[in-house]
C-alpha cells in the first residue's frame, strides 16, 4: 500500500533546498500520515489518513 492519504490524496512531494548562494540539493516533503482503522463498505480496514483529514472530520474511525 502506497503512503498516500486515502481521503485527501496527499503524498510525498519533492523539491529543492536553496542556499544563500542558490546552490540546490534535493529534498522531500512528507505529509503527516497516520494508520487508522475505518469502515469501508461496512468492513473495518486499515488505511493511511493525513492528520489534516483526521482533524477536519473527514475520517470516521471504528
Curated annotation (Swiss-Prot):
InterPro entries: Bacterial_rp_bL28, Ribosomal_bL28, Ribosomal_bL28/bL31-like_sf, Ribosomal_bL28_bact-type, Ribosomal_bL28_sf. It holds the Pfam family Ribosomal_L28. The keyword Ribosomal protein applies. Transmembrane segments: none annotated. SUPFAM superfamilies: L28p-like. Keywords: Ribonucleoprotein, Ribosomal protein. The keyword Ribonucleoprotein applies. One of its GO terms (biological process) is translation. GO terms for cellular component: ribonucleoprotein complex; ribosome. Coiled coil: none annotated. GO terms for molecular function: structural constituent of ribosome. Gene3D superfamilies: Ribosomal protein L28/L24. Belongs to the bacterial ribosomal protein bL28 family. This is Large ribosomal subunit protein bL28.
Amino acid at each position: 500500500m502506497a503512503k498516500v492519504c486515502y481521503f485527501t490524496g496527499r503524498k510525498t512531494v519533492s523539491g529543492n533546498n536553496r542556499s544563500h548562494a542558490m546552490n540546490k540539493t534535493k529534498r522531500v516533503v512528507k505529509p503527516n500520515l497516520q494508520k487508522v482503522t475505518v469502515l469501508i463498505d461496512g468492513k473495518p480496514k486499515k488505511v493511511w489518513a493525513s492528520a489534516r483529514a483526521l482533524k477536519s472530520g473527514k475520517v470516521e474511525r471504528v
